[in-house]
């Protein structure tokens, strides 16, 4: 499932530029919020919805992408927001930061050389495709009346690497996703034995 985090930034209406947005929010204050989340949650991959270059069409959107890039670096730098390190978090370097490009209206930022993933998989446990789950989620957007039709089948998303190493074959290239990462070899062995002996019948 997903976990949602909040900063002290809030939607104050249409903003013409990221500079206006960051001035209103307090650039360093909000950057520290994003930095804290990265250090606490420790993501391996960070994906932004909007670019830093303005195609998102809204100051808040562009500012969020700028903050993501700055926090990607700051979270790994012990000289940035050092007071956080006394509150139970440590520095953290995510493997990569990507921008999920889009083709919306008259703006197409997708390119053939960008990394592609198919988000249209089906979850047999939930009995729904990820497109259906996403549609249900968007229908809960309270302030702007969003909503999209549920869909099944292939949904290709394009991702442009902004910082860190670019993925070649998988979004989690060079990331340890095994149980060994939990730091408990016995746990990994136990899980492997359970999987080996599991009989659905």
Question: Residues of each region from the PLM?
Answer:
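The feature marks non-catalytic terminal segments
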Residues: 74-201
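Active-site beta-strand->loop->alpha-helix modules in alpha/beta enzyme cores, enriched
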Residues: 1-81, 103
């Amino acid at each position: 499932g997903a976990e949602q985090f909040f900063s002290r930034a809030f939607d104050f209406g249409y903003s013409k530029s990221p500079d206006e947005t960051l001035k209103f929010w307090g650039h360093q204050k909000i950057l520290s919020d994003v930095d804290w989340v990265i250090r606490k949650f420790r993501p391996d991959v960070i994906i932004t919805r909007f670019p830093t270059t303005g195609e998102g069409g809204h100051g808040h959107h562009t500012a969020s992408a700028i903050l993501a890039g700055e926090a990607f670096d700051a979270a790994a730098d012990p000289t940035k927001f050092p007071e956080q390190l006394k509150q139970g978090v440590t520095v953290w370097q995510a493997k990569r930061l990507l921008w999920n490009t889009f083709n919306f209206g008259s703006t197409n930022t997708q390119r053939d050389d960008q990394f592609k993933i198919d988000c249209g998989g089906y979850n047999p446990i939930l009995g729904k495709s990820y497109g259906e789950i996403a549609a249900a989620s968007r229908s809960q957007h309270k302030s702007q009346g969003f909503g999209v039709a549920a869909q099944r089948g292939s949904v290709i998303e394009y991702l442009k690497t902004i910082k860190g190493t670019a993925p070649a074959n998988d979004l989690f290239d060079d990331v340890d996703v095994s149980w060994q990462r939990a730091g408990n070899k016995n746990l990994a062995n136990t899980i492997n034995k359970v999987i080996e002996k599991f009989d659905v019948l």
